[in-house]
Amino acid sequence: MNPTLGLAIFLAVLLTVKGLLKPSFSPRNYKALSEVQGWKQRMAAKELARQNMDLGFKLLKKLAFYNPGRNIFLSPLSISTAFSMLCLGAQDSTLDEIKQGFNFRKMPEKDLHEGFHYIIHELTQKTQDLKLSIGNTLFIDQRLQPQRKFLEDAKNFYSAETILTNFQNLEMAQKQINDFISQKTHGKINNLIENIDPGTVMLLANYIFFRARWKHEFDPNVTKEEDFFLEKNSSVKVPMMFRSGIYQVGYDDKLSCTILEIPYQKNITAIFILPDEGKLKHLEKGLQVDTFSRWKTLLSRRVVDVSVPRLHMTGTFDLKKTLSYIGVSKIFEEHGDLTKIAPHRSLKVGEAVHKAELKMDERGTEGAAGTGAQTLPMETPLVVKIDKPYLLLIYSEKIPSVLFLGKIVNPIGK
């Protein structure tokens, strides 16, 4: 039996990422060279963010097609980061397939890893109003003896933490990993790993955790039970939050949908896309990066009466199956080439699990404290009521980049 490399992609808490790339040039030229390097990293990060959005839309369409009537929630950034890190260990057709599937093929490999390094460094924030953490942990069996260069690059580019794990005792290894994840998430995610394939010698865990409060919070005293209309002429009662305020809002005639931005603190925005009656599939088909860019041009500041369902949902997907939709499969097979991790071992990715969890309430996402007030101009408000299936993006203006992407067909369902 060939040893397998387990890959688990989780959404959780990680320590603050710090810049780890060290200059190898003289102090006199440091400023000029660092400015050039910084510019190149920003350009690479910007292109990667665009490709991450494209990946997210592709996966959302595929998952929606194969999982009709089901809530979908994922982090394209989390998935891309993990597989970009695996590019450090992949070669030949296995590497080419990842680059093709994830839209990395036109980017030099050095720019690819430096671009993700920049994204991780720039997006990681920890303040009273916002906590955003991204990172990776490698659980490695001593039998593997991985290449030092792979470990160093994983640390330098992806701030990867390395933890020795005895995969010969699968029960103990499972407990160690689950305890680690539980600790990092302050008990929010428990027993995430349900089983580990025999023969596993390494497991990679990618994390992204987001907790923020709204720039202007909803008043929980006005939240009330209202109807949310499902796709098949039925409805469920959901706690509907309400607020009147100034928001960026627009309408797309081509895709028959309303676009509403509700800002969090610190340049993070929740973007709600509400299709007209019977237009959800039409909207899904039209999802692409250029569509998102066009939406931005349609927005204007208006006084809006907003009604949004409170929700708490989890999206769990088998990436081995999901990524086959975009042509990525060799890394999971016996003939996959991961010899840059360990040249004398035949490795494959045995497990690939993506789990994303979202809690959205009156205070924000994952809860926070504080209040906010807003003075409104005297104008007739536009009414936007999110009371039927919709799409949701959580978006950072800083890179800019889509952090999370979802299709919500039932706020209280699975």
From Swiss-Prot:
SMART domains: SERPIN (SM00093). GO terms for molecular function: molecular function inhibitor activity; serine-type endopeptidase inhibitor activity. Keywords: Glycoprotein, Protease inhibitor, Secreted, Serine protease inhibitor, Signal. Changing residue 302 to A/E: Significantly impairs KLK7 inhibition activity. Slightly enhances KLK7 inhibition activity. Gene3D superfamilies: Alpha-1-antitrypsin, domain 1, Antithrombin, subunit I, domain 2. It comes from the Eukaryota. GO terms for biological process: gluconeogenesis; lipid biosynthetic process; negative regulation of gluconeogenesis; negative regulation of lipid biosynthetic process; phosphatidylinositol 3-kinase/protein kinase B signal transduction; positive regulation of insulin receptor signaling pathway; positive regulation of phosphatidylinositol 3-kinase/protein kinase B signal transduction; regulation of cholesterol metabolic process. It is found in: Secreted. Highly thermostable, with a Tm value of 70 degrees Celsius. Incubation at 60 degrees Celsius for two hours has no apparent effect on KLK7 inhibition activity. Polymerization is observed at 70 degrees Celsius and above. Transmembrane segments: none annotated. Forms a stable complex with KLK7. PANTHER family: SERINE PROTEASE INHIBITOR, SERPIN, SERPIN A12. Belongs to the serpin family. The reactive center loop (RCL) extends out from the body of the protein and directs binding to the target protease. The protease cleaves the serpin at the reactive site within the RCL, establishing a covalent linkage between the carboxyl group of the serpin reactive site and the serine hydroxyl of the protease. The resulting inactive serpin-protease complex is highly stable. This is Serpin A12. It comes from Homo sapiens.
